[in-house]
């Protein structure tokens, strides 16, 4: 019997889209997009976060001003209900993905522990 692991992965991706954790994230993001101010702040935060991560990956030090700016923006967006809901939905989906990764990776871990 030949196993096509990619078929299994594609089926898993399809199944994922029906789970409450995925649907919750999808709905939370749709709600966020309807709030122009919150969505604009969210996108600004994402852009700044990406810029700072790239800078760090290139071995550059972040300035105190950059750190303060991203912290202030994070605090502002953290007070917005639509963003809080999105973050909670992301956390729930991330927890599920971590559990799935542990299941999938178990045979590899078993090799090293055996």
Curated annotation (Swiss-Prot):
Instruction: Give the species this sequence originates from.
Output: Latilactobacillus sakei subsp. sakei (strain 23K)
Name the chain's protein: UPF0342 protein LCA_0622
Family label: Belongs to the UPF0342 family.
Superkingdom in the source lineage: Bacteria
In terms of HAMAP family, this protein maps to: UPF0342
User: A single Pfam family, by name?
Assistant: Com_YlbF
């Amino acid at each position: 019997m030949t196993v096509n692991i990619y078929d299994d992965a594609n089926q898993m991706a399809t199944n994922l889209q029906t789970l409450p954790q995925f649907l919750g994230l999808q709905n939370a993001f749709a709600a966020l997009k309807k709030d122009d101010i919150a969505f604009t702040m969210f996108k600004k935060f994402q852009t700044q976060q990406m810029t700072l991560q790239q800078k760090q990956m290139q071995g550059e030090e972040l300035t105190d001003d950059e750190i303060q700016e991203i912290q202030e923006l994070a605090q502002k967006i953290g007070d917005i209900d639509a963003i809080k809901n999105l973050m909670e939905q992301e956390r729930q989906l991330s927890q599920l993905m971590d559990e799935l990764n542990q299941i999938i990776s178990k045979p590899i871990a078993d090799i090293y522990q055996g």
